[in-house]
Amino acid sequence: MAKMAAALHILVKEEKLALDLLEQIKNGGDFEKLAKKHSICPSGKKGGHLGEFRQGQMVPAFDKVVFSCPVLEPTGPLHTQFGYHIIKVLYRK
């Protein structure tokens, strides 16, 4: 079972925007460019890169998705207390 992961994410306040961004990404949009333009998370400045983190380091709902969704497939929107996330897991190990 994976204990570490690396992921990108885009965090926005509105679900509609999250859905629109996910659609753009699935249609070939550049995840990192969209993160830089739209994400309200400080990681947006780095293209949404969260770096590598341990299982259990993130809020539970985010953690659950990161450690269960398909790798390299944009997933979301996931609602947490921070807003709506679009997540792309780069790897798990």
UniProtKB/Swiss-Prot annotation:
It catalyses: [protein]-peptidylproline (omega=180) = [protein]-peptidylproline (omega=0). Belongs to the PpiC/parvulin rotamase family. It comes from Salmonella typhimurium (strain LT2 / SGSC1412 / ATCC 700720). This is Peptidyl-prolyl cis-trans isomerase C. PPIases accelerate the folding of proteins. It prefers amino acid residues with hydrophobic side chains like leucine and phenylalanine in the P1 position of the peptides substrates. PROSITE patterns: PPIC_PPIASE_1 (PS01096), PPIC_PPIASE_2 (PS50198). It is found in: Cytoplasm. One of its GO terms (molecular function) is peptidyl-prolyl cis-trans isomerase activity. Keywords: Cytoplasm, Isomerase, Rotamase.
